[in-house]
Design a protein with these regions (language model features):
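Surface-exposed amphipathic alpha-helical segments
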Residues: 166-198
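Soluble non-cytosolic domains of exported or imported proteins
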Residues: 54, 102-110, 177-185
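Bacterial N-terminal signal peptides that target proteins for export
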Residues: 2-26
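C-terminal motif of bacterial Sec signal peptides marking the signal peptidase cleavage site
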Residues: 33-37
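N-terminal "mature-domain start" segment
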Residues: 41-71
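Extracytoplasmic/secreted envelope proteins and their assembly/folding machinery
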Residues: 60, 109-114, 184-191
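Alpha-helical transmembrane segments
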Residues: 28-32
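Conserved polar/disulfide-associated segments of primarily extracytoplasmic proteins
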Residues: 66-163, 168-169
Length: 198
């Protein structure tokens, strides 16, 4: 017995049906692409832990640690986009100080913007875009977002600050404004990963 022929769709399908079918297929492809991008955004992070085990954070795969003699305790930068950096600065503060004693998230964010990110005479202007307070592991963190304006370009910076045992920890990730939409989620994951462990 000969196999029955495969059904053939009539060529005279209504154009509205074809339009809907095309829209569904295109929508499914776009959703699939979007979901694969979301799942990849959490991937590609490595853990850095201080030699004494005091603190740890995540940094993007492919970034290299850079040795610095003055300033930040730890610096990483992207090999491909060399103006993308991640740095940890540790400063001494009064042992009795808490982050809340230094001011609200907005007050601390504005002060860091004026003194650290865009000090007078630096040629930079820092605009505090957002300041959020969060609790994690019994510590208060301030997560800060800045738009930084320089004479020849604009940059974006995310930072988190926390006080513990007389030290102010500031972890900051920075990129140029053109790359910001591509790395925003990644940078948020990095700065909120900072933890005090002992």
């Amino acid at each position: 017995m000969a196999p029955s022929p495969s059904p053939v769709l009539p060529l005279s399908l209504p154009s509205s049906f074809l339009t809907r079918l095309f829209s569904w297929v295109l929508g499914a492809l776009l959703i699939g692409a979007g979901l694969s991008g979301c799942s990849a955004s959490g991937a590609g992070l490595n853990t850095f832990q201080s030699p004494d085990g005091r603190y740890a954070f995540l940094y993007p795969t492919g970034w290299n640690r850079v040795a610095v003699s003055d300033g930040p305790q730890v610096v990483f930068h992207d090999l491909i986009n060399s103006d993308e950096t991640l740095s940890l600065v540790i400063s001494d503060v009064n042992d009795t100080n808490s982050l809340e004693n230094l001011g609200s998230a907005v007050a601390v964010g504005e002060k860091l913007g004026r003194i650290v990110i865009a000090p007078e005479g630096s040629g930079r202007q820092a605009e505090l875009v957002e300041a959020i307070e969060r609790e994690d592991g019994g510590h208060t963190f301030y997560d800060l977002e800045y738009a930084v304006h320089l004479a020849d370009r604009d940059r974006h910076e995310l930072a988190t600050v926390v006080v513990d045992r007389g030290r102010l920890y500031t972890l900051a990730a920075s990129t140029n404004e053109a790359r910001w939409p591509k790395v925003s989620d990644l940078f948020h994951s990095v700065i909120t990963s900072f933890t005090l462990q002992i």
